[in-house]
């Protein structure tokens, strides 16, 4: 029972409920598993990082459009894509916004890196960096970090992260879906507990009473001894 009521208990409950639907004998399994379910975390206990691969691509697209407000005629060109094979995010058409786009080049971007390029780096968990191409003493070109422009771009990157944190939980439907998905993916496991209350110790002084944690520790030891 200890082993059955541990591990991915959400998945075990689904299996038990399917079994109970055709065989009432499994109803007792569902009752025990329901009691073993981890307490659901709520939104205030969940940290959703911009770039988390479990967040639906459509939500990132929605965030981008609502925050950067690209012109409607550009929205089909500027698209968030995610590759499950490489776990990499891409924003197509990120260079299409006009230089007059305030959100793209001032509020959330700079003249050297617009908001869409910065968002793409953020989704891929990269700090935005701005480089200049210069010639060295031998006339060869090399890239040199532009510290001033990099600092400015990273300030915009932080502004995008902050905007996402303010946005992600605002919509009740989105909040409910993300909370459910997070709990399903990352809060479904229950560690195994070892119950030693059933163990009887023959020949032991009846005046000696083992505490609960001592009995459980003995149960754990006995299980390990019995395992090959």
Residue spans of the language-model regions?
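Short coil/turn segments at secondary-structure boundaries
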Residues: 178-181, 192-200
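Pre-Walker A adenine-sensing motif
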Residues: 215-222
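Charged, low-complexity intrinsically disordered regions
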Residues: 1-188
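Conserved small/polar residues in nucleotide/adenosyl-binding loops
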Residues: 223-228
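Dynamic helix-loop-helix/coil hinge segments at AAA+ ATPase domain boundaries and subdomain interfaces
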Residues: 199-212
